[in-house]
Amino acid sequence: MMNHQFSSLERDRMLTDMTKKTYDLFIIGGGITGAGTALDAASRGMKVALSEMQDFAAGTSSRSTKLVHGGLRYLKQFEVKMVAEVGKERAIVYENGPHVTTPEWMLLPFHKGGTFGSFTTSIGLRVYDFLAGVKKSERRSMLSAKETLQKEPLVKKDGLKGGGYYVEYRTDDARLTIEVMKEAVKFGAEPVNYSKVKELLYEKGKAVGVLIEDVLTKKEYKVYAKKIVNATGPWVDQLREKDHSKNGKHLQHTKGIHLVFDQSVFPLKQAVYFDTPDGRMVFAIPREGKTYVGTTDTVYKEALEHPRMTTEDRDYVIKSINYMFPELNITANDIESSWAGLRPLIHEEGKDPSEISRKDEIWTSDSGLITIAGGKLTGYRKMAEHIVDLVRDRLKEEGEKDFGPCKTKNMPISGGHVGGSKNLMSFVTAKTKEGIAAGLSEKDAKQLAIRYGSNVDRVFDRVEALKDEAAKRNIPVHILAEAEYSIEEEMTATPADFFVRRTGRLFFDINWVRTYKDAVIDFMSERFQWDEQAKNKHTENLNKLLHDAVVPLEQ
């Protein structure tokens, strides 16, 4: 049953095997850009390996606004080309993984004296529809003030003139990343998490490999490759320093936080994109019985590994909520969870964080190290295509075979083999029935079918196999089934991997995490044969994340 190529129980073997081959491409960084590049390259026939020093998607790729969006706000900066490319790309991302990405109608209210008026909103959304190639059923409509309040009664009534209504796509960024990575594994890619590149290896001034440290065991491995890509997001400049090539352009990190509230406190029924008092734009989005709101955009110069919410960040978002939804009187005590993430933007002199372009660029150093900088979640597939085209051309120049064009445009990602978006609901309905037949509640069966898509049978098989063990441990069987699946087929190596990135529960169901964490940690501890010290360390790490999700940095 185990997928040997992507089980965290196989990490040692995988790392040892890597030292015995020379790869066409070695990718440093296991976020969405690295995962997309691995899938593109492996599906063209390249031999690909990848290392990620934390967990997959642990950096920016699990901390976004969780929208595959068309970039409406970039029209304000007249970034027409970006809106056109990203908008079209959005539909492709959706079709290839409809279980992780879903259309979400967005309300854009406009008030007297706000950033957008009726005319600019209408024109802006029309241009957006045109540039982004929006399909007919999802084209924007304009609403009166009365219609706007029917869509969302909580919106500020004072000065309300109307609203725009258009489609965004909501996603689970971390699961999108892991599903892309799993599809890359199917094509033969070899990704390993918790493996840090300590240094680059050179021959005659050219980068020919990496020295990797397994962060969990402290063992070291030398791995060789014809081409090396730096897809480390916020860390790209650190790797360029190792390569002595950090000159010219560099990154500017900005931080964005999101707050999560229970629907009982913030009963939003409709996603809203709205003005803040200082002229920025913020999203409020209902999701799984919660409402989440963000984001901020502030220059960040602290440690990159664990950005935290500050009191100032928190208060800014709360003030924005109470400005647009004045009847709620939200306070800091209402916050159930939060997250903070970094945008790895390409520095532009004299620009405010919100004005800096989100475009991506590829830089090649004298040693041949290829760096991908900037970019957006939505554009990951296109970015990967550009990188792999460059790698293909360089390899061809050096006498290697031609690996041909990109194949990912109509390629479902792992879990996405459900017959396209039009068949998703019938697929989920059928699988929900199977889950109920296996003894699960309708709610749990449906949630599993949506989360795992066409891989859900692998989870259902484990529901059958783990019934006795679940009863013995006094934990619902589907939780053990998910945990085992994520260890054996999604390279989950720590409790945080499972609770934060494989299930998103630390953000969207934090009390569930508090309820089941000890039982899941016990289960994982036996699977990984952790000693007491290791088990305590993993427990402490998870408890710290639970604390940081609610308590700002200064408290």
Curated annotation (Swiss-Prot):
Question: What does its record list under induction?
Answer: Requires glycerol 3-phosphate and the GlpP product; repressed by glucose.
The protein's required cofactor(s) are namely: FAD
What GO CC terms are in its UniProt record? cytoplasm
List the Pfam families: DAO (PF01266), DAO_C (PF16901)
Gene Ontology terms describing biological process: glycerol catabolic process; glycerol-3-phosphate catabolic process
Q: Which UniProt keywords apply?
A: Cytoplasm, FAD, Flavoprotein, Glycerol metabolism, Oxidoreductase
Ligand binding (FAD) = 24-52
Q: Which reaction does it catalyse?
A: a quinone + sn-glycerol 3-phosphate = dihydroxyacetone phosphate + a quinol
Copy the pathway line from the protein's UniProt record: Polyol metabolism; glycerol degradation via glycerol kinase pathway; glycerone phosphate from sn-glycerol 3-phosphate (aerobic route): step 1/1
Q: What is its EC number?
A: 1.1.5.3
What is the annotated localization of this protein? Answer: Cytoplasm
One Gene Ontology term of the molecular function aspect: glycerol-3-phosphate dehydrogenase (quinone) activity
| UniProt similarity note | Belongs to the FAD-dependent glycerol-3-phosphate dehydrogenase family.
Q: What's the name of the protein? A: Aerobic glycerol-3-phosphate dehydrogenase
The encoding gene: glpD
